[in-house]
Each structure stands twice: as structure tokens, then as C-alpha cells.
Amino acid sequence: KSIDHNHLMTYHPRGRYTSAKWWSKAKWLDFHTFQSGHRKYGQRMGNKDYPIPDNTEEDNWMYVDSTWAYKPIKPVLDAEPSYEDIPKGLHDPNEERWQDYDVRRYAYWSVFAGSCGHTYGHNAIMQMLKPGYPTSYGSDGAEKPWYVALNDPGFNQMKHLKNLMLSLPYFERVPDQSIIAGENGERYNRLLATRGNDYLLVYNYNCVPMKLDLRKVS
């Protein structure tokens, strides 16, 4: 940072951690990131030190909450959520793959929880995978090349979240779970709410019935 004042700097932590754990007061760090990782609910993989409650692996919104608890408050985003078409948990090629609706959920959950943006990833694009080359994640010979992956639905849907956020006053928007009247759901039934001065948005992944406190906006 001392030799380059013109570029933003951050730190990419390991899975299930936020950079604020180590660098909350670092002056060189312009914004925080966390890595919610690639595991599905209940996919703990061993008994090593685990920094999150069991069965919360997909709840990337909780990292936004925990990062905002550090002072001074800085912008934050999910630098590595689950990637489209990558095996759940990364390393078992026989696992199910993360789909477009999964990466969409991660994006909306994170942004509505208060992230300043989001990171999209794709198994093939991450590796710039070409025919004839081995893959790091998945089954060799069965993976699409990166230029075909550019047509995948998750890749082409991220623009809708960006356009939505930029269509509204960006700097007045705040996360506000008090909009959810009554009990909120868990896992895929979790509602995430955000608002500005005269609008509110709620992400409802499973289309569950919901009650909202509309007094939160003028």
C-alpha cells in the first residue's frame, strides 16, 4: 500500500473465515472479504477446528453479520462462494454439482445481508479448462471447456442482481432483518431483507409465506 495508493487492497481468507478476524484494524486493507466456501449443509469433512456452527455451511449471509461486528466497519463481500458446476465440497467428483439456482441464492443472500458486491465463479472458467487438459475438480474428460461455460445460466444471471442494485440509491441501502415480521426460516427458507429510504427488497428463495413490516420505509 505504501508504494501503490491507487488500487484497492484486501485479503482472501481460507474457507469459513473472514479477513476481519486478523485484519480488522489494518490501515492497508480497504475492504473485507470472506470465503463461505463450497460445502453443502452438514458437509463438515473431518474433526479439525471448525469456526462455524454445525450445519450452517451454506449460510453465507452470517459472515456478513460477523464481519460487520468488527470495528471500524468496512465494506465486505463473499470472495469465494460455491462455484457453478463444481462438485459440492470440491474434491469428490461423484458429488452433486452446484447449479445456477444455488449460485444465485448465494449472491442474493450475501448482497441483501449487506455485502457491497459479490464474486461469481465457475468450475471450468476458474481453470480456463480446455479439451485435452486434466481438471482439478470433477471428472477428467467429462468437463466442459471454459468458453462453453460462458453460456451457463448462472454466469448470465449475475447481471440481473447488479442491475437491480444499481437501479436504486446505492449508498443509502442497508440490511434490515427487522423488516421480517415474526419468525424467520432456516436454511433454504431463510429470508434476507434490505431497504433504502423509500423501498425494500426481500429475497425469498423457496417462495415461503412471509409477513413484512412495511413501516420500515416512508
Task: Give a label for each model feature.
Residues 72-76, 84-86, 99, 103-218:
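Aromatic- and carboxylate-lined catalytic core of secreted/periplasmic carbohydrate-active enzymes
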Residues 1-107:
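Substrate-binding/catalytic cleft of secreted carbohydrate-active enzymes
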